[in-house]
From Swiss-Prot:
Record-given protein name: Matrix protein
Record region (Essential for glycoprotein binding): 115-151
Domain observations: Late-budding domains (L domains) are short sequence motifs essential for viral particle budding. They recruit proteins of the host ESCRT machinery (Endosomal Sorting Complex Required for Transport) or ESCRT-associated proteins. Matrix protein contains one L domain: a PPXY motif which potentially interacts with the WW domain 3 of NEDD4 E3 ubiquitin ligase (Potential).
Taxonomic path: Viruses, Riboviria, Orthornavirae, Negarnaviricota, Haploviricotina
Domain of life: Viruses
Described purpose of this protein according to its UniProt entry: Plays a major role in assembly and budding of virion. Completely covers the ribonucleoprotein coil and keep it in condensed bullet-shaped form. Inhibits viral transcription and stimulates replication. Plays a major role in early induction of TRAIL-mediated apoptosis in infected neurons.
Gene (UniProt): M
Homology family: Belongs to the lyssavirus matrix protein family.
Record membrane topology: Peripheral membrane protein
Quaternary structure, from the entry: Homomultimer. Interacts with nucleoprotein and with the cytoplasmic domain of glycoprotein.
InterPro entries per UniProt: Rhabdo_M, Rhabdovirus_M_sf
The entry's keywords: Host membrane, Host-virus interaction, Membrane, Phosphoprotein, Viral budding, Viral budding via the host ESCRT complexes, Viral envelope protein, Viral matrix protein, Viral release from host cell, Virion
Length: 202
């Protein structure tokens, strides 16, 4: 068993920073709950505090025996407490993680890799969000480890403001992305300009 665990841990990239540890999920953690109150559903009509970002996101999952979204969701429920990036862009990072994990993974050795590369439109509430022209290069490893199972979650997100026409991060309210945003406690409020649009509060 120890030999297997050593092999498993070799699928992680070597990182200088110590990965954050997350405790085991409760047995009833796989319930599919309603998403947060409001996410963008249609084209954004209000232009207030709207910014386009060119996004490159990658979520790499290392696990020897496959993995369930039950454990991933449990890990992401602790995201606010373990996030090590720029706090002004944590909402953007949550959106990218949710969208990436809603796509199809590509096997890579003992890893499953989810990638997203697109231009997205974000709107923040007044005085929230990144500073004008601010960019993000965020990388973090989070692990869940006990005597029977190991899962390593590597997250990389780069974001820079760009002038390419972007898409709103609209998605079906019953989608996996919405559930993941709910797990990560994505903070939003309904826009005064457009009832179908949410402003990020983080």
């Amino acid at each position: 068993m120890n030999f297997l665990r050593k092999i498993v841990k070799s699928c992680k990239d070597e990182e200088d920073q110590k990965p954050a540890l997350v405790s085991a999920p409760p047995d009833d953690d796989d319930l599919w709950l309603p998403p947060p109150e409001s996410v963008p559903l249609t084209e954004i009509s209000g232009k207030k505090n709207m910014r386009n970002f060119c996004i490159n996101g990658e979520v790499k999952i290392c696990s020897p025996n496959g993995y369930s979204f039950k454990i991933l969701r449990h890990i992401l429920k602790s995201f606010d407490g373990i996030y090590s990036g720029n706090r002004r862009m944590i909402g953007l990072v949550k959106v990218v993680i949710g969208l990436a994990l809603s796509g199809a993974p590509v096997p890579e050795g003992m890893n499953w890799v989810y990638k997203i590369r697109r231009t997205l439109v974000f709107q923040w509430a007044e005085s929230r969000g990144p500073l004008d022209g601010e960019e993000l290069e965020y990388s973090q490893e989070i692990t869940w480890d006990d005597d029977s199972e190991f899962i390593g979650l590597q997250i990389r997100v780069s974001a820079r403001q760009c002038h390419i026409q972007g898409r709103v991060w609209c998605i079906n309210m019953n989608s996996r992305a919405c559930q993941l945003w709910s797990d990560m406690s994505l903070k939003t409020q309904q826009s005064d300009e457009d009832k179908n649009t949410s402003l990020l509060l983080e």
